[in-house]
Amino acid sequence: MKKNLLRFVLPIIMVVLLSSFAWHKFYVSVTQIDYVPNKKRIEITHRIFIDDLEKAFEKKYKKKVYLTSTKELSDAETLIKNYLKENIKISINKKPQEIVYLAREVEGDVLIFYTKIAISKKINTFEIFNSLLTNVYSEQQNIVHVNINSNK
């Protein structure tokens, strides 16, 4: 009798417990920054989920951009450049730097952006401001990996 009761009650308890947890999406972007001395530049790679970026653009520009699809807006590249410029700021030796947009590519449901900064002097201090997607998601986390002068 106890065995039969357990077979009946245990699945019900499991369903109730598991259904009390709501699925929550993880909001994250990853930025990799590498100083390449022989090229005298800093190379920057940003990885951002396509749907998150589209939502940010829709909120900011009040229109659907349809990134990476056949419906992508003709000015999408300009919107991307402007968005990155507004949300990523880097200072080296206490001086703001110009970040040059190079290209983008798609990897699954992630957009990868490539940018660079030309460097002519030794890097003594490095500061970054990264506010990607923070205007859309309060839970947004922007992870930044930095490798400069062999310091991580």
Which residues fall in each region the model found?
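Bacterial Sec-dependent N-terminal signal peptides
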Residues: 1-26
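N-terminal soluble domains immediately following signal/targeting peptides that reside
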Residues: 23-152
